[in-house]
Each structure stands twice: as C-alpha cells, then as structure tokens.
A protein has these predicted regions:
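Catalytic, metal-anchored helix/loop core of enzyme active sites in primary metabolism
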Residues: 1-390
C-alpha cells in the first residue's frame, strides 16, 4: 500500500482488519507520518516499509523507529513491485505515486487506484500500460466505484452518459459574492466527508469533481460529452449510468470509503459485512428523500476548466494539477481568495503550450512548469498579468 497513513490508507487497513484471513500486508509506504507508519508496521509486519519525506527531522525519526525503512520514490517503487505483492493500493496524494504505480503495472500487479493525479496527468500512459500488461485498474474513489459497479455486465456502446454525483461541498448555496469572501474555515467545513485540507478545498471549488471527470474518461473510455456532474447533497447515490433505452443504474450506500475500498479488494466477489465492524446498512425510510441539482458553472469555474483541460488533452491536465497544487496552499495560508484559485488555473493554462502526445517526462515537466508559473502569477501585479495575456 502506498499512502498507508492517509485517510484512504487507514480505512484500507480497517478493511484488512475486518477480514484478517483474506489478506497479507506485504508493503507499507507513507510520506512523513513516521510514528503512525511504525505503529502500522508493528501491527501488520510487512516485508517492506518506505517513506518519502526529505525533512531532516522526519529522517532522524525514521532512523530511530524504522531503521530498515526504504526512502524516496525508489523505496515506493520497491514496495509496489515486491514479488509477493498481488494488489497495489495506490493511495498517495499528489504526484509521487505516479512512477511506482506505472512500475507496478509493468510488473503485473492489480491496481486498486485511489490517487487522482495518476490518471488525470498520465491517463494515456497508465491505461496503455495496463492494456499491454493485462492488468486491472480497479477504482477506489466512491464515484468511480459506483460507475464501475453499474457498468459491470453492460456494453459501453449502450451507455448514453455517466452521471457523477457531487455533494456540492460547503459552498453549495453560497452566492458568487459570498464565495469571494469565504474564509478558510468555511471552505474546510465539508458537510459529508472528512478529508485532508487540499482535497477538501478542491471539493469546495469542485476542482475535485473536475478531476473525477477526467479520471472517468480514462477508466471507462467515455467521451467528455457523455460525462456529466449533478449535485446530490445527501451523498447517498454515488454515481449513475444512463443507458440508451432511458434506464438508469446507480449505486447507493451511506457515505463511507470502506465500501468502495472493500469492493476493489474483494473483486470479483462481494463479501458479507454483517458480522464485521464495517457494517453500515442503508435504511431508505430514514433517508426519506433524495435531492438533485444542476451545477452552476459560473460559481464553480474550476469544473469548467477541468472539462476544458480534459478535452484539450496532452499536457493540459498536468498543468491544471500543477497550478492547483500551488493555488490551494496559497488560499489555505490566507494569501489569496478562494475565487482566485480558478483565475490562477485559467491564466496558467492560457500561458501553456500543450504537448499533444506527451511522455512521462513531458507530463512531469509540464506539471513542474505549472507550479512555477502559478507562483509567478501570484507574485505578479494584476496589470502585468493582463498585459501578458493580451
């Protein structure tokens, strides 16, 4: 598992604990939470432990608590490709999991994918490698898991559209003027999910949903014109598939990441959860009603930008990811407004010359360029930005 100390990683280990006779943990890797990683290593006794942080204090702690731990991307790759590994849970955040995941695919490992950047930035490379190696890419995100379950046994040619649901986040009802003045605390107050700060802000801007649209394009080989986002504040219906005969299949459950994680790890079977600590059945009577709303692109321009970057293809999605990686921390630090995030992304995309069929190095270089360009934009007076874009 890559990202074992993060939210998805910890919940994956909950699934492992619920079914101890079905799993053996071969490798655990994380970024810099050494104390928790060491605790996990004591509990699950993996053959490999790895971490990626370059912080000197973290490295000193690792030398004390995990003296045999591997370090860096090489350590993650060794974990992902270990001969005893059958399934890799790719749950790191950001770009660092891309190379190890590709290496695992080429080594013939089944991939349970929870890392968005892998497909958003390099979907053409990842899916081509998976086809060549005969490897399954199993989605862990709740929305893509719902689509995957609804598409099983169906013919893609009979699909009219994929409908990805969005809770709408903490700013679903906010006016554009209110969004300009929103505080960090307000943007982090997600009504449904408890996640890290970066992904919570991406949920508030609907950038997260835009990245999911690009992911769905690659996972299910579906044109962007056949992928739509609909707001569903209860987060009970996780996504839907509409077919050419007007029928719709959907997957519903109470919001919990344990279920899509388990579905990926148990595939093609379904395991009975009734006797486990994960049991979380849905009562329709308690739900009462379900609501759906259209997305207001004027208030959530990040979703529009994701569609545009996805349709443009090439290195454009990598630029979107790179610019967002810089813009969100600036907002969290109180240096820009929430609405400035979309403006920074749009301007960075406008300044980029897209490479149509990029290599992995092209993708990573484009993301790095976008990170630098977004920071330059932040330090650039508005008048200068306007002159540059003319």
């Amino acid at each position: 598992m890559l990202g074992s100390t993060g939210s998805v990683g910890r919940q994956t280990l909950d699934v492992v604990r619920a079914y101890p006779d079905r799993f053996r943990v071969v490798a655990l890797a994380a970024r810099g939470n050494i104390a928790l990683l060491a605790e996990q290593a004591r509990e699950f006794a993996p053959e490999i432990v790895a971490y990626t942080s370059d912080d000197p204090a973290t490295q000193a702690q690792a030398a004390d608590l995990l003296p045999h731990a591997l370090h860096g991307v090489a350590g993650l790759t060794a974990a992902a490709t270990h001969p005893a590994v059958q399934t890799l849970v790719a749950a790191t955040s950001g770009l660092i999991g891309l190379r190890p995941t590709l290496a695992a695919i080429r080594a013939g490992k089944t991939i349970a994918l929870a890392n968005k950047e892998t497909l958003v930035m390099a979907g053409h490379l990842v899916m081509a490698a998976a086809r060549e190696a005969g490897v399954d890419i199993l989605p862990v995100d709740s929305e893509h898991s719902a689509l995957w379950q609804s598409l099983r046994g169906e013919h893609t040619a009979e699909v009219r559209r994929l409908l990805i649901t969005a809770s709408g986040g903490p700013l679903r009802k906010a006016t554009l003027e209110e969004m300009r003045a929103v505080t960090v605390e307000q943007a982090l107050a997600h009504p449904t999910w408890r996640m890290g700060q970066k992904i919570t802000i991406d949920s508030a801007t609907l950038m997260n949903k835009g990245l999911e649209v690009i992911e769905a394009h690659w996972l299910f080989d579906m044109p962007y014109d056949q992928i739509e986002v609909v707001v569903h504040p209860q987060s009970i219906i996780h996504s839907m598939v509409e077919f050419v005969d007007d029928s719709i299949k959907m997957q519903a459950s109470l919001p919990s990441m344990h279920l899509p994680i388990q579905d990926a790890l148990s595939y093609p079977a379904r395991w009975n959860r009734a006797a486990t600590a994960l049991a979380h059945p849905l009562s329709w009577a308690d739900v009462g009603h379900l609501d759906f709303e259209a997305v207001d692109m004027a208030r959530f321009p990040c979703l529009r930008l994701a569609y545009e970057a996805g349709r443009r293809g090439g290195t454009a999605p990598a630029v979107l990811v790179g610019a967002d990686e810089q813009a969100v921390p600036l907002f969290l630090a109180g240096k820009i407004r929430l609405t400035d995030i979309a403006e920074m992304l749009e301007e960075t995309l406008a300044r980029h010359t897209v490479i149509e069929d990029p290599t992995l190095e092209d993708v990573l270089a484009a993301c790095s360029w976008a990170q630098d360009e977004a920071l330059r934009l932040y330090g650039e007076p508005a008048a200068a930005r306007e002159r540059t874009s003319e």
